Amino acid sequence: MAVPPVEMYSGSFWNRMRKPLPLRTQVIRFTVVFVIVSFILVVALQITHERMPDPKVTKPLPDLGFELLTKVPGMYVLADCCIGFLNILSVFTAFKLYLLHRHCVGSGEPELPCNIPGVSRFFLSVWLCKENCRIELRNIHTIAWIRFITSYALLLLSRSIIMVVTSLPNPDDLCQNPPKIENRVKDILLTVLTAGAGSIHCGDLMYSGHTVILTLHLMFHWIYGAMVHWSFRPVVTVVAIFGYYCIVASRFHYTDDVLVAIYLTIATFIAVGHNADGAPWQLQLFIRWWPCCGANSREVAEDGVPVAIVIKNEEMMNFEGKS
């Protein structure tokens, strides 16, 4: 049996493990991790689809939300519209955060080849933050993306496990006569490429994936959207709550699916946190050993300014001490 080297138990080893990877490397590698997790999720969706109890035998479970809210078939489409709107708003917010980063490092506003009055001003101007300005603006867009994508990957991975463990009867009308998956490979690719919109899977309950992304956008704008414009918080809050209503009213998920997803998403987003070093060092351990997709050391500052490293040997230090 191989004996671990002594240095693994030393402080220097763990100090190296805690040393943060470059932010650009984290962006690339965690995005790749998210794609891999997406494929794992689709495989889990196929398993739950096959294991779902027969709707003709097992009826949906009693649900207080179903009793309080009138059933409105097809409302899940509006939930998809809410997600689409928040996707666009989050991309816009991330771009504005990038402009704040440029302003922080002293770069000027970007310019379009042709100036369009009003449009250029709206998209390319720097909206100086008036809330949460205690957060360092340097690399704010990169850190926000790392926090978003790592939280999302963690939630999807846990969802892949949880929904396979216990199969629940599906309350959704579309799943009362569930379609059969003919080509599994095609279904996997179609589901990943369309973010689930191009296929129908049943039994993927506990917890709601729609609620996860709605809540992630809510948390993203609650922290970072307020730095761009004060109105983003109330607007996104209203849209997210309406999306929750659409999910329950359409019987797309049980109320518990929505409540558990809200809690787990908020807790995960807070646990990942905002840090100038990017993701927590424990998460960086999963991507630190990669031989590709970015550098493993911060030899150059994130804004592209070279870092000067001064090394003094012992003889030089002794000479300076004597002089």
From Swiss-Prot:
Its EC number is 2.7.8.-. It catalyses: an N-acylsphing-4-enine + a 1,2-diacyl-sn-glycero-3-phosphoethanolamine = an N-acylsphing-4-enine 1-phosphoethanolamine + a 1,2-diacyl-sn-glycerol; an N-acylsphinganine + a 1,2-diacyl-sn-glycero-3-phosphoethanolamine = an N-acylsphinganine-1-phosphoethanolamine + a 1,2-diacyl-sn-glycerol. The chain crosses the membrane at residues 27-47, 75-95, 148-168, 188-208, 234-254, 258-278. The keyword Calcium does not apply. The keyword Chaperone does not apply. Its main location: membrane. It is a multi-pass membrane protein. GO terms for cellular component: endoplasmic reticulum membrane; Golgi membrane; plasma membrane. It is found in: Membrane. Signal peptide: none annotated. It holds the Pfam family PAP2_C. Disruption phenotype: Elevated ceramide levels and growth arrest; cells were arrested in division but replication of DNA and organelles continued giving rise to cells containing multiple nuclei, kinetoplasts and flagella. GO terms for biological process: ceramide biosynthetic process. Predominantly synthesizes ethanolamine-phosphorylceramide (EPC), with minimal sphingomyelin (SM)/inositol phosphorylceramide (IPC) synthase activity. Specificity is likely to be defined by residues in the lumenal catalytic domain that interact with the polar head groups of the phospholipid donors. EPC is synthesized by both stages of the parasite life cycle, bloodstream forms (BSF) and procyclic forms (PCF), by transferring the phosphoethanolamine from a 1,2-diacyl-sn-glycero-3-phosphoethanolamine to an N-acylsphing-4-enine (ceramide) or an N-acylsphinganine (dihydroceramide). Belongs to the sphingomyelin synthase family. This is Phosphatidylethanolamine:ceramide ethanolaminephosphotransferase. It comes from Trypanosoma brucei brucei.
